């Protein structure tokens, strides 16, 4: 065990933020392999699609798709259009610009096509090339993937979710006895291609083998075999062995001799005695079971032939036709049952040998023979005809059409494609050896499938499991888009063919033939509206990562929710290490949408693989291999937690292992593989839950899902009790910025970091990296994306170091919530049923405050009555309402806005109405404007109040630019200019430093003005000359001179690159924007809203412990600890036992210990600071170092000892609040570890403390569990849900108020509420609810008028929905009328009808 611990410490040291803060990891298991990048799935797949790299053997690619459609030939064969190659040009706008302008991030695609024109000789029909033309054709834009694995489509980030579908190949299955009443198993086989017709083979209730093509009407399978070119005898010989029966002794009654095969007789119980044909002895008596041992012994004893009675020949089947050559008389046909008449005929002809099929009804059944007899077809033509009739009913078949149809179904690469995957699966299942380039079916494949199916019926082998991950594969972005693009290209091909036949081919160019619209439309449709192209969940970095790693079984070509049964949704043993058994949505999609496990990756065939360590001769090596579910089947896999000795052998004799889906205790020498890590089982979200092993699965599921809904807070704080995965997620999600190469920090401010690269810069590369930070950007979910620098000027960074924190990250670690002090106790019913009681301190100190950014936009369009105008000059609006607007009518940045405030003034012309003379006069006096326009300004909707953080103005090209737009443009150009200048400065500095080193000590063979030739160049000489002149030196050393010239050309190239980039961006800014048709100007206003925690907000821990805030209590009333610290949150202890998520209690205790240890570090640091006011001249902080070593233990001793004083102080000051711990999933702190930490922190090892009531000051009756829990604030905020309505929109038909906040709707008074009022007998309230408060149109207007006047009487009329009912009845021909009866009149039934 010791060896493991050291390894882990080394690993911990090697990884990132340990510089600023060490997370104390409790895990014992050393991980041999690094976790693959978390968004590799997306990037890898799209990279394969976009650039089919020539060096690597890619399976898919855009080029492959283009090659599969081209060459396109015209109908007459006089021309063909061929594909040469394609290239993607650089995109017009970068990702930021695309987001701002609302356009797609894509690269224009140029395809080089070659048009070959042939001349056809009329007589000989030979073709000769007449003309060849090549041309580059623009084929639309191809969306590009951003560095983080997303696409920007129309300005919004989208993710393409991978799809899980049935793998192409062959599947054998049975109906589980459900079809037939007897419960007998009907076996079936299905060949699934990647595209093309499905081929199904199935047994029916009469045990006949049938075939279906594309799920159409079934045919006997022999019809298909005939069509493949076999005759009945070949069919029988393929499926059955033959046995030669010879007459014994030639006399009629003596019986028949057959060779003795021990396998055939094992376990059988013949009704007759088995006699040795040679000796005549009885070997096995009648009606006795023959054991395998006895059968083998008989063979050893020399038994060669058996003698069987003549009756045994009857009811067996002939293997071939027996015909009298001379007369042509048929004695017996192949497949016929042998009867006494046949024997007589054969005896008469003197034939004493019979070839019979080896069908014994036990090991081999007569299924194919029976099918042959049922089949009406008897030769190839009839077989083809039968297939044609099923596929094209109603059309008369000719031999040619039938043959062409059959060929096209399975043997034509254009229409049928198994894909490499399908071929590999077919080969594996049926033991074939075709190359994986053979992607159509072959005759052998079909025969092998039928043979395997018949074998299953005979009890040989097993059926496949559809839910095994070996039979399901993943289609990622690249492949999905490839399929879509292919569809588009095929549509385009049709158009091109028609075009080629309608124009004169000799005069046209490829450009005239190609119309790329269908291909572009297919791509656009896929990204815009496919079920798998989803709006990215950007709530926090974890939700982004999870969304990209999601695998869905839904979508085109997948399952639907309604049809998916239990089996598909269930966890399967092959999910281990591939798909997370925990993380899946609750609700109708459960089990259909999954997440990849942490170490999983998708191989080139689309199967999910997971890594294992190789075990050789009982010794665990450090070699790691990735295996798919199929490859893993034959192995015995030990768990990652199995104990090992120093040299890697297993400590125990028997080891807990898995084999083919079963858990067993295996002897250590039989183990062949070992897990690489305990967390390879779970997904990213689940691996972030500490003490996951102590939580119930259902709650762990909720915990994983709710972490994805945590809102980024104003001040992020990493969890004190984590799992060590936090850093990986922050880094791979792209939320935290990492340095692309090592260097020295040159400049830092809030919006950018400039790093000067160290070491030799490759030619053509810039020697400086500028990282632009995102400031207060809006995410897809309206949360705030804000990045903060972590580095200081002069600091040295290495490639991969975190240099800036993003949303929900703290020092490069994921930080979704806050560490809060929690007590588990009831408090006056305020935490009944999962409610949460919180302290006012949390609100006051902005602990759970988050910023949300809302976007509002307004467009000025060109209307029929004239253009709309964005202006400050709005009719009937006072100066007070315009206080926040500038001259252009757009709100200032920094303005505080409230509901109803104008964000952007806009006026729209309204139709001319005829004017009265008075109006005309007023108009003449007071000017035009006022009456012919109406106010359509953008106002802040109710429920939103905040600060304007950004305004963007977009103008159509050619429209005059207003001042505000000009100001925004100038600001942006200044920023670009600054970037450009900084890059130039650093380039100059680096170049001249290199040049100085090269020139010093050299002899000048040429020199700038004022310097003599032949001088030796030294420091003083160089200092006296302007740096720009240095390049004029030439030196005598030729070698050095070449180097100097190389530096010069490199410098010129880099400088030109910097200038070009600046000019290009500036030009883009000054160019007009591409707006939707009819839009002249668009303004976007971003308002930042601060959301404090308030009652009704939802909070949760990481263990599925969720609740809603019920009350915010003043600090002084909260229960407090002995040292006077009030707790932050009071949770209900009853939420733990029934839910069985005990992990939260472990977390509470360990978190409390972390807080206590942090306190100790803080005290040591404060003592040192008090003794050393001047840290530079002070003593080394030995006491602080000792405290740190005590807190962290032996494992981190070397790390802490190796740090400088300044680093020790920085480390300690980051730990004063609490010491971060890491308890990896399934390998974390045990109960003993938690107790030890509590004791080290000086806390009672029970983890319980005496609490005092804040209101009375008395101690509570018994000790209470108090500790630190990491709480998250979830995206379900009460502000987004609550709203109020007085009068609002009504539904058109029923005239009832709409529902929901988005529609500004009302509260539904439903059936149950009506029953409640009925039960109370509240007749008038009920009448009011159902009439004037709902859909009595006249009544509700009257009520409104009455209320305005201060009156409170009203009269209920007929609800509109009653009128709708009446009209519906009339539409059915039932006339219903309401007529009022005078008092005293009764209708026929004696019922009084009230007056209308």
Swiss-Prot record:
Record's subunit section: The RNAP catalytic core consists of 2 alpha, 1 beta, 1 beta' and 1 omega subunit. When a sigma factor is associated with the core the holoenzyme is formed, which can initiate transcription.
Example GO BP: DNA-templated transcription
PANTHER family per record: DNA-DIRECTED RNA POLYMERASE I SUBUNIT 2
EC numbers, comma separated: 2.7.7.6
Sample GO molecular function, one term: DNA-directed RNA polymerase activity
Alphabetical keyword list: DNA-directed RNA polymerase, Nucleotidyltransferase, Transcription, Transferase
Name by which UniProt lists this protein: DNA-directed RNA polymerase subunit beta
Annotated InterPro entries: DNA-dir_RNA_pol_bsu_ext_1_sf, DNA-dir_RNA_pol_bsu_external_1, DNA-dir_RNA_pol_su2, DNA-dir_RNAP_su2_dom, DNA-dir_RNAP_su2_hyb_sf, RNA_pol_bsu_bac, RNA_pol_bsu_CS, RNA_pol_bsu_protrusion
GO cellular component terms listed in the entry, alphabetical order: DNA-directed RNA polymerase complex
Cross-referenced SUPFAM superfamilies: beta and beta-prime subunits of DNA dependent RNA-polymerase
Known function: DNA-dependent RNA polymerase catalyzes the transcription of DNA into RNA using the four ribonucleoside triphosphates as substrates.
Similarity comment text for this entry: Belongs to the RNA polymerase beta chain family.
Catalytic activity: RNA(n) + a ribonucleoside 5'-triphosphate = RNA(n+1) + diphosphate
């Amino acid at each position: 065990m010791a060896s493991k611990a050291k390894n882990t410490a080394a690993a911990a040291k090697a990884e990132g933020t340990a510089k600023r803060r060490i997370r104390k990891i409790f895990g014992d298991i050393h991980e041999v392999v690094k976790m693959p990048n978390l968004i590799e799935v997306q990037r890898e797949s799209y990279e394969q699609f976009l650039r089919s790299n020539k060096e690597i053997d890619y399976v898919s690619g855009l080029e492959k798709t283009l090659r599969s459609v081209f060459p396109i030939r015209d109908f007459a064969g006089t021309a063909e259009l061929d594909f040469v190659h394609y290239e993607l040009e650089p995109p017009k706008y970068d990702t930021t610009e695309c987001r701002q302008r609302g356009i797609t991030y894509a690269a224009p695609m140029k395809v080089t096509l070659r048009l070959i024109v042939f001349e056809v000789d009329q007589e000989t029909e030979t073709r000769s090339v007449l003309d060849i033309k090549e041309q580059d054709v623009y084929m639309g834009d191809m969306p590009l993937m951003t560095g983080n694995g997303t696409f920007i489509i129309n300005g919004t980030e989208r993710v393409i979710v991978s799809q899980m579908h049935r793998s192409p190949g062959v599947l054998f299955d049975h109906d589980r006895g459900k079809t037939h009443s007897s419960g007998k198993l009907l076996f079936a086989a299905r060949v699934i291609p990647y595209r093309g017709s499905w081929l199904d083979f199935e047994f029916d209730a009469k045990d006949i083998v049938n075939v279906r093509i594309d799920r159409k009407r079934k045919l006997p399978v022999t019809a298909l075999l005939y069509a493949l070119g076999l005759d009945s005898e070949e069919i029988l010989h393929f499926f059955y062995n033959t046995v030669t029966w010879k007459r014994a002794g030639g006399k009629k009654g003596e019986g028949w001799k057959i060779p003795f095969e021990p396998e055939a007789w094992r376990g059988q119980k013949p009704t007759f005695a088995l006699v040795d044909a040679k000796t005549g002895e009885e070997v096995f008596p009648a009606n006795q079971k023959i054991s395998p041992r006895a059968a083998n012994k008989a063979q050893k004893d020399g038994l060669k032939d058996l003698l069987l009675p003549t009756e045994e020949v009857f009811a067996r089947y002939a293997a071939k036709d027996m015909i009298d050559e001379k007369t042509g008389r048929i004695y017996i046909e192949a497949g016929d049952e042998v009867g006494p008449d046949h024997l007589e005929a054969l005896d008469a002809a003197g034939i004493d040998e019979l070839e019979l099929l080896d069908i014994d009804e036990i090991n081999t059944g007569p299924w194919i023979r029976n099918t042959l007899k049922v089949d009406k077809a008897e030769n190839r033509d009839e077989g083809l005809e039968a297939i044609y009739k099923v596929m094209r009913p109603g059309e008369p078949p000719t031999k040619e059409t039938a043959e062409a149809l059959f060929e096209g179904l399975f043997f034509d690469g254009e229409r049928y494609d198994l894909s490499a995957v399908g071929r590999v699966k077919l080969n594996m299942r049926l033991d074939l050896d075709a190359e994986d380039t053979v992607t159509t079916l072959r005759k052998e494949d079909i025969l092998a499938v039928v043979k395997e199916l018949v074998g299953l019926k005979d009890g040989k082998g097993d059926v496949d499991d559809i839910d095994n991950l070996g039979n399901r594969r993943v289609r990622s972005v690249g492949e999905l888009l490839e399929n879509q693009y292919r569809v588009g290209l095929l549509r385009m091909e049709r158009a091109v063919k028609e075009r080629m036949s309608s124009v004169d081919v000799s005069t046209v160019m490829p450009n005239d033939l190609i119309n790329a619209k269908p291909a572009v439309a297919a791509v656009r449709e896929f990204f815009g509206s496919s079920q798998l192209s989803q709006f990215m969940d950007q709530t926090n970095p974890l939700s982004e990562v999870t969304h990209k790693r999601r695998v869905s079984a839904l979508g085109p070509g997948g399952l639907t929710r309604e049809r998916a049964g239990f089996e598909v949704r269930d966890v399967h043993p092959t999910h281990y290490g591939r798909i997370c058994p925990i993380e899946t949505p609750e609700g109708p999609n459960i089990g259909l949408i999954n997440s990849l496990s942490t170490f999983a990756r998708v191989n080139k065939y689309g199967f999910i693989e997971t890594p294992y360590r190789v075990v050789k001769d009982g010794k665990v090596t450090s070699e790691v291999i990735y295996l798919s579910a199929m490859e893993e089947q034959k192995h015995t896999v030990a768990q990652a937690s199995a104990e090992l000795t120093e040299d890697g052998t297993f400590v125990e004799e028997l080891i807990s292992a898995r084999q083919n889906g079963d858990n067993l205790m295996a002897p250590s020498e039989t183990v062949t593989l070992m897990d690489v890590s305990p967390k390879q089982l779970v997904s990213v979200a689940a691996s972030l839950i500490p003490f996951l092993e102590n939580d119930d699965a259902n709650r762990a599921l909720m915990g994983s899902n709710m972490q994805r809904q945590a809102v980024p807070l104003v001040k992020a704080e990493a969890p004190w009790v984590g799992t060590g995965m936090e850093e990986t997620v922050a880094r791979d999600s792209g939320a935290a910025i990492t340095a692309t190469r090592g260097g020295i920090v040159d400049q830092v401010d809030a919006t950018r970091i400039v790093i000067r690269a160290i070491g030799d810069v490759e030619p053509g590369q810039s020697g400086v990296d500028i990282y632009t930070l995102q400031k207060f950007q809006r995410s897809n979910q309206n949360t705030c994306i804000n990045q903060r620098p972590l580095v200081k000027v002069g600091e040295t960074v290495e490639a991969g170091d975190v240099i800036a924190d993003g949303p929900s990250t703290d020092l490069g670690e994921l930080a979704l919530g806050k560490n809060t002090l929690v007590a588990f106790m009831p408090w006056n019913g305020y935490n009944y049923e999962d409610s949460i009681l919180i302290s006012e301190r949390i609100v006051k100190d902005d602990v759970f405050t988050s910023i949300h950014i809302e976007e509002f936009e307004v467009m000025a369009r060109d209307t029929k009555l004239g253009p709309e105008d964005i202006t400050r000059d709005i009719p009937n609006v006072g100066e007070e309402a315009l206080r926040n607007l500038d001259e252009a009518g757009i709100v200032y940045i920094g303005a505080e806005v409230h509901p109803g405030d104008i964000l952007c003034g806009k006026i729209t012309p309204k139709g001319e109405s005829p004017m009265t003379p008075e109006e005309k006069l007023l108009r003449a006096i007071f000017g035009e404007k006022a009456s012919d326009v109406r106010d359509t300004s953008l106002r802040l909707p109710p429920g939103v109040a905040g600060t304007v953080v950004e305004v963007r103005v977009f103008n159509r090209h050619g429209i005059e630019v207003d001042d505000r737009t000009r100001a925004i443009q100038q600001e942006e150009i200044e920023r670009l200019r600054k970037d450009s200048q900084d890059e130039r400065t650093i380039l100059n500095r680096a170049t001249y430093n290199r040049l100085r080193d090269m020139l010093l000590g050299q002899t000048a063979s040429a020199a700038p003005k004022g310097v003599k030739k032949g001088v030796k160049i030294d420091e003083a000489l160089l200092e006296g000359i302007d740096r720009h002149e240095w390049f004029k030196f030439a030196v005598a050393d030729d070698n050095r001179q070449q180097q100097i010239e190389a530096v010069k050309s490199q410098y010129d190239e880099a400088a030109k690159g910097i200038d070009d980039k600046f000019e290009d961006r500036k030009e883009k800014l000054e160019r007009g924007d591409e707006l939707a048709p009819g839009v002249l100007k668009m303004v976007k206003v971003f308002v930042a809203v601060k959301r404090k925690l308030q009652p009704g907000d939802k909070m949760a821990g990481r263990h599925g412990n969720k609740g809603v805030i019920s009350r915010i209590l003043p600090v002084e009333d909260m229960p407090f600890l002995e040292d006077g610290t009030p707790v932050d949150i009071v949770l209900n202890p009853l939420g733990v036992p029934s839910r069985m998520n005990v992990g939260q209690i472990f977390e509470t205790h360990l978190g409390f210990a972390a807080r206590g240890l942090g306190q100790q570090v803080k005290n040591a640091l404060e003592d040192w600071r008090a003794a050393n006011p001047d840290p530079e001249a002070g003593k080394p902080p030995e006491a602080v170092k000792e405290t740190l070593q005590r807190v962290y233990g032996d494992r981190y001793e070397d790390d802490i000892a190796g740090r400088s004083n300044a680093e020790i102080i920085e480390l300690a000051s980051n730990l004063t609040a609490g010491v971060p711990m890491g308890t990896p999933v399934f390998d974390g702190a045990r109960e003993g570890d938690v107790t030890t930490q509590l004791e080290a922190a000086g806390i009672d090892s029970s983890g319980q403390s005496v609490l005092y009531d804040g209101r009375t000051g008395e101690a509570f009756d018994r000790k209470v569990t108090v500790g630190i829990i990491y709480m998250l604030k979830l995206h379900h905020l009460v502000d987004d849900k609550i709203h109020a309505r007085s009068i609002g929109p009504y539904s058109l038909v029923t005239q009832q108020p709409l529902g929901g906040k988005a529609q500004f709707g009302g509260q539904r008074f439903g059936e149950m509420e009506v029953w409640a009022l009925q039960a109370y007998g509240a007749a008038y309230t009920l009448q009011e609810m159902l009439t004037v408060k709902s859909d009595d149109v006249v009544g509700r207007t009257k009520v409104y008028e009455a209320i305005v006047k201060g009156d409170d009487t009203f009269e209920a009329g007929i609800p509109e929905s009653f009128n709708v009912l009446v009209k519906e009845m009339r539409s059915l021909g039932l006339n219903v009328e309401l007529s009022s009866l005078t008092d005293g009149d009764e209708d026929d039934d004696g019922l009084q009808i009230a007056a209308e």
